[in-house]
Amino acid sequence: MKIFLDTADVYLIGQYYGTGLIDGVTTNPTLIKKSGQDPEEVYRQIALLGVDDISMEIVTDDSYEFLKEGRRLKEKFGEITTIKVPCTPEGLKACKLLSKEGIRVNVTLIFSAAQAVLASKAGACLLYTSPSPRD
């Protein structure tokens, strides 16, 4: 099992990552932008803390945009890059394409075991399960 901190608060990441109990970080570019920051600058700051797995979300609904942006982020940030895509038909298609190129993928918005199986079959290395809306 791996534990990922779901935040872009660099100070908080530094505190928790330093415990040795956190395996990586997941981020949300929409929330980063709302805070007035640039997502790629935040990724750079997180990387400087020594975090070796950052899930970088791409906001699109087109598998080829996921692929294009995923390649660009992998080129820029290297081995710390994991691309975060939703468990949608386009997200799963992108997962398959990215993973075939050796780019790690974290599939999010998983609400059922069936979705987890689909994401695994598409090549996801991480699955982010969401709480059931009924919980």
Labelled PLM ranges:
Residues 2-4, 24-26, 53-55, 80-82, ...:
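Structural preference for beta-strand elements that scaffold enzyme active sites
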Residues 9-12, 19, 33, 38-90:
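Active-site beta->alpha loop and helix N-cap motifs at the rims of alpha/beta catalytic domains
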Residues 128-135:
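Conserved small/polar residues in nucleotide/adenosyl-binding loops
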Residues 98, 106-107, 111:
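The catalytic core of metal-dependent phosphodiesterases that act on cyclic dinucleotides
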Residues 16, 114-118:
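Catalytic cores of alpha/beta
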Residues 1-11:
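N- or domain-start disorder-to-order transition segments that initiate the globular core
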Residues 28, 83, 119:
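Conserved, mostly hydrophobic/aromatic
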